[in-house]
């Protein structure tokens, strides 16, 4: 029974109290009493009122408390299976119900219709209003999927230990059935379900993350279903809890049941890792021919919520499509429970296909459909909203990835001719980049008055979520701040530090950052002065040494090689408590002189040489962050970082995506790659790189 509204409770209680107080004489007149004298109304009526009033107030408070407790409980966000755990990794029964049972409107579920792609942006804007209220309503209108199916096999005593979570089970009608092993009852069971794609029946298998006792079954399923691709959407541990048992060897070979699994290759990228396995059954009647299985492990899903941007997921999904053979069996997709992130991935794939085929998307209908195949697919309203964000990203920007062999033709199209640049194509691409919203609400620290004084350009402030944090000086507020941002590399998160050229009063902070974050490489892309304006305080000594705070910088070497000055500094921390071997480091600065005061470099070779020299230095000193600065820490700095990432990908994959590389940087620090000229320069450098290494094998 639903609790009464508080206003109704108040409306009910006051008349009742008035009746009880006002009718006291009526009640007295109807009573037969045996008192020896006449009653004293002046004494009995106030006494009764004083007794009843506290009781009524107490009743009212209790009813209000019950209502608000129920209301708060109903409004609590749907939690994922990873959020509520007992120490042994099993969900408590009461917490399970919050996952499984979704509130329903008493008037019945609301209807949701397909959205034409041209209306997608506006529909998302409407649904996102009021803290995504309409997205939550839409999500909560989804059927859970439990009513439509039975779970007899999953609930058998022999199979209960095979389920990671006792409330996330496969339907009998859509479960994956393994071959029965002789003498082992229920050995045909695994917690996995067939899931349809947009048009393809059973395109996917949605599975839980293998447990130690189900790893053999997992590989048996991969072999029997002829699957060639595994998509993994969880880390082995998150928040110190096991989400998935490691079901592959780090190197060499291992046998799981009767399936031998050998590692053939492993490539680690910033958002995901690709592992290649050779698998082969070991049978008494001889071995069958081995098969190649690719595992694509998405590593950028945070422990809480969803990825900050869908860019990484879209790149990952494209790589899955590229690597999965045409005639292979179902793609095996798993996270921990096999419903939340797994469902999110499958829905994005299906709706992208629908977008191409019908120029519309129908997320609500598709999620409802696949929940009939595996209950609770897409587990939270945040995941549901993320699906829409990914689809909008794809619709607005499309696929801008290029093979190196098609770059020249692409540039001709963008430029109109090979001699005179018709900037229409490039200008349109760059215009889309300028539409990337600057998230001022995420710049609170940099916009504090004390920290604004440390900014060279007040429009270029680091975001709070990836700013470089210094150790706080004792008794001195705001000393943990510097205008610097961590930026992802091609293979490694936080591979770069993008910062402004130090000011006279921030030099000490600059060297503290270099020391505390163990940066051995500095890339400088500006002169100290340009056009008679200060662009960067000279933070190093021309000869001898200089001390800033507790750090002494001594110059050991200064050589000029073409357009690059290479300076080696001996950096010493002057702290008595520090161990001697930890007090001294060598830091190398690459000062690029090839950037003119106005515009961009005339050719790309100087930048290619600079990037190569920096990468060689990193290999020798370890992959600590590379500190990159110009004057404001956005234009030339962003161009250098973008080119480093783009050229690294060209060498590794023979692919490039200048647009998404720059867009990703702008989501990490405002105004990265600041001008159309700098954006065009990125394309020019890649073309020069390909011309220099025209033999494809030289950089693939």
Swiss-Prot record:
Annotated InterPro entries: Prot-tyrosine_phosphatase-like, Protein-Tyr_Phosphatase, PTP_cat, Tyr_Pase_AS, Tyr_Pase_cat, Tyr_Pase_dom, Tyr_Pase_rcpt_a/e-type
UniProt entry tagged with the keyword Repeat: yes
Binding residue positions for substrate: 303, 335-341, 379
CDD domains referenced in this protein's UniProt entry, alphabetically: R-PTPc-E-1, R-PTPc-E-2
Residue intervals on the Cytoplasmic side: 70-700
Sequence positions bearing Phosphotyrosine: 696
Post-translational modification: A catalytically active cytoplasmic form (p65) is produced by proteolytic cleavage of either isoform 1, isoform 2 or isoform 3.
Residue stretches making up the Tyrosine-protein phosphatase domain: 135-394, 426-689
GO terms for cellular component: cytoplasm; nucleus; plasma membrane
Signal peptide: 1-19
A GO molecular-function annotation: protein tyrosine phosphatase activity
Note on domains (UniProt): The tyrosine-protein phosphatase 2 domain (D2) mediates dimerization. The extreme N- and C- termini of the D2 domain act to inhibit dimerization and removal of these sequences increases dimerization and inhibits enzyme activity.
Subunit and interaction comment: Monomer. Isoform 2: Homodimer. Can form oligomers. Dimerization is increased by oxidative stress and decreased by EGFR. Isoform 2 interacts with GRB2.
Name of this chain's protein: Receptor-type tyrosine-protein phosphatase epsilon
Organism phylogeny: Eukaryota, Metazoa, Chordata, Craniata, Vertebrata
